[in-house]
Amino acid sequence: MKPRHKKLAIIASSVTALGVASVLVLNAFQSNLVFFFSPTQVANNEAPVGKSFRIGGLVEEGSVKRQADGVTVNFLVTDTAKVIPVVYTGILPDLFKEGKGVVAQGKLASDGIFRADEVLAKHDENYMPPEAAGALDQADKARKTVMQ
């Protein structure tokens, strides 16, 4: 092979390898990407049914109900505008309380119940996940606009 052909072969191989690597990385990102939705967005059918995503807001007061098995918990997540029922089987975080911030990851069933695989609770009095805080602010502004 001439030096010029070798150089072209190396460039072509490099471009092909870079393309394959890019496809693999994008595929990995796509399969691990988890979107965040507020209860209002879920209630407005903006969230995918049967696909994993996160929902965040406040645990509605008086909504936490433990099942007889001791590990399944039903509760409601709200952004002060809409409410979504959540079912979680597992041990809840110590800081999980009614009226406090929560982010749950799982799938929305066709019956409208969010089946959580993981529940994350607010960890101090001043912290709320940015997505949940933004969703609460947006829902509160919308509610105030409607009331005027």
From Swiss-Prot:
Bilayer disposition of the protein: Single-pass type II membrane protein
Binding site for heme: H123, Y127
GO cellular component, one term: plasma membrane
Top-level taxon: Bacteria
Transmembrane parts of this sequence: 8-28
The family this protein is said to belong to: Belongs to the CcmE/CycJ family.
Name of the protein in question: Cytochrome c-type biogenesis protein CcmE
Lineage, highest ranks first: Bacteria, Pseudomonadati, Pseudomonadota, Betaproteobacteria, Nitrosomonadales
Gene field: ccmE
